[in-house]
């Protein structure tokens, strides 16, 4: 049977059991033929799997005719989609969505290379977008910087004004304080003079007269006592 399987050639629409690594023999259908120019066992068929509606490229050694292998591989299986695949291969072998999906998947499988180009194009677009965003970011950054500089200048000016303003009131307060002190001194100084004018020099023990007058009074008293002491002696001599 293996010899007949190796020599078997399939055509589009043939129903088979396809074997993939990690999966049981799965009901499938041949959708695409290998290139006619190259005929060798290395050529692979595009296979559509019933139940899962997935496609894969398999060689002839992994394909088994459905009718001949139905009893062997057509036993129920718990794998998801397997029982649905058995139903589809019996009741709807030419499912409409299968042809569209197979051709679509074929284009996706056969043309994986343009995707990097598209990715590169997206990268360029992203780069341009990033570049533009960088430029916008610079503009946005520059504007806040200017605003910060302006705000800093305003803050400095305001700080200078605040520093000057407390100094000025102090300077303004000092002259007023000096004027007040001078006024109080002027008010206090004339008081002794008025008291001296009101007081009389004849008042004994007042202590408010000037010290020179007191000294003169003491000298006069001393001279008067001396004269009184000398006077009795002179009188006695005259009597003799």
From Swiss-Prot:
Motif (Bipartite nuclear localization signal): 155-170
Segments of skewed composition (Acidic residues): 110-121, 212-225
InterPro entries for this protein: PWWP_dom
Cross-link (Glycyl lysine isopeptide (Lys-Gly) (interchain with G-Cter in SUMO)): 80
Keyword 4Fe-4S carried by entry: no
Residues with the Phosphothreonine modification: 184, 200
Subunit structure, as described in the record: Monomer, and domain-swapped homodimer.
UniProt name for this protein: Hepatoma-derived growth factor
Native species: Homo sapiens (Human)
């Amino acid at each position: 049977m293996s010899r007949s399987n190796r020599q078997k050639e399939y055509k589009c629409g043939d129903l088979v059991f396809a074997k993939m690594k990690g999966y049981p023999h799965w009901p499938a259908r041949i959708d695409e033929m290998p290139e006619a120019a190259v005929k060798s066992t290395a050529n692979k068929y595009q296979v559509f799997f019933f139940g899962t509606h997935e496609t894969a490229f398999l060689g002839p050694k992994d394909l088994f005719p459905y009718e001949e292998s139905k009893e062997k591989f057509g036993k129920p299986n718990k794998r998801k989609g397997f029982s649905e695949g058995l139903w589809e291969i019996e009741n709807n072998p030419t499912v409409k969505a299968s042809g569209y999906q197979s051709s679509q998947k074929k284009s996706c499988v056969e043309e994986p290379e343009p995707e990097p180009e598209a990715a590169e194009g997206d990268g360029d677009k992203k780069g341009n977008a990033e570049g533009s965003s960088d430029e916008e970011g610079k503009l946005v950054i520059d504007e806040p910087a200017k605003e910060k500089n302006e705000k800093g200048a305003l803050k400095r000016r305001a700080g200078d004004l605040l520093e000057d303003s407390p100094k000025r009131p102090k300077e303004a307060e000092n002259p007023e304080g000096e004027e007040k002190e001078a006024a109080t001194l002027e008010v206090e100084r004339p008081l002794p003079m008025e008291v001296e004018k009101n007081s009389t020099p004849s008042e004994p023990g007042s202590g408010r007269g000037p010290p020179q007058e007191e000294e003169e009074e003491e000298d006069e008293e001393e001279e008067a006592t001396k004269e009184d002491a000398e006077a009795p002696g002179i009188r006695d001599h005259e009597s003799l």
